[in-house]
From Swiss-Prot:
HAMAP family in alphabetical order: Ribosomal_uS3_B
Organism field: Desulforudis audaxviator (strain MP104C)
Assembly and interaction partners: Part of the 30S ribosomal subunit. Forms a tight complex with proteins S10 and S14.
PROSITE patterns tied to this protein: KH_TYPE_2, RIBOSOMAL_S3
Record-linked CDD domains: KH-II_30S_S3
GO CC terms: cytosolic small ribosomal subunit
PANTHER family found in the cross-reference section: 30S/40S RIBOSOMAL PROTEIN S3, SMALL RIBOSOMAL SUBUNIT PROTEIN US3C
UniProt-recorded Gene Ontology molecular function terms: mRNA binding; rRNA binding; structural constituent of ribosome
Record-given protein name: Small ribosomal subunit protein uS3
Length: 218
């Protein structure tokens, strides 16, 4: 099971929180879910160079609070906060709701699986050898404190006629251990030979769920 599913979804409510927090009845649920997708797609397309890993959305009545987790907060905020204000107004126009935006800086992007996947994909698009790109990403992550990392690339690697999957890993990535803090990221490299999928798993240590921690401290 742990080998097949997204490790983030498997750990929801255990060591990981939801990326969206709101409640809606049957009538409004699908519309609000679609609105979340539009918000995320718009922010990602607007801020391609900002290194955005995660977009957290909370809703209360007619107000939407958005937290953007980024490796380059300066790009999102802009000089004097102009860029983030423009983004806020555009999102209000898109949704018809009050929007507030909070920027969260990612201190070590080398330990963020989504950013690592996007970085490897960008290198593949620049025709960097896939083994070299994977090895460099793994080396940086391990150097900065990762307990383990696994990267897979799949597609027509190096222009081969037949698509295949290649892996590179270091350390351990315990996918079946639910208390393990495992981050997962996926990105695609669009090459002249077709798309190459990049998947990244990063194990950052164990997190003791709050209930177990409280009971252990008694």
């Amino acid at each position: 099971m742990g080998q097949k599913v997204d490790p983030r979804g498997l750990r929801l409510g255990i060591v990981r929180d939801w990326d969206a927090k709101w409640y809606a009845g049957k009538k409004d649920f699908s519309n609000l879910l679609l609105e979340d997708v539009k918000i995320r797609d718009y922010i990602k397309s607007k801020l391609l160079a900002a290194g955005i890993s995660r977009i957290h959305i909370e809703r209360t009545a007619n107000r939407v609070r958005i937290a953007i987790h980024t490796a380059k907060p300066g790009v999102v905020i802009g000089r004097g906060g102009t860029e983030v204000e423009v983004l806020r107004k555009e999102l209000e126009k898109l949704t018809g709701r009050q929007i507030s935006i909070n920027i969260v800086e990612i201190k070590t992007p080398e330990l963020d699986a989504q950013l690592v996947a996007e970085n490897v994909a960008a290198q593949l698009q620049r025709r960097v050898a896939f083994r070299r790109a994977m090895k460099q990403a793994v080396g940086r992550a391990m150097k900065l404190g990762a307990k383990g990392i696994r990267i897979s690339v799949a597609g027509r690697l190096a222009g081969a006629e037949i698509a295949r999957t290649e892996w590179y890993s270091e350390g351990k990535v315990p996918l079946h251990t639910l208390r393990a803090d495992i981050d997962y990221g996926f990105s695609e490299a669009k090459t002249t030979y077709g798309k190459i999928g990049v998947k990244v798993w990063i194990y950052r240590g164990e997190i003791l769920p709050e209930r177990a921690a409280r009971e252990g401290g008694r």
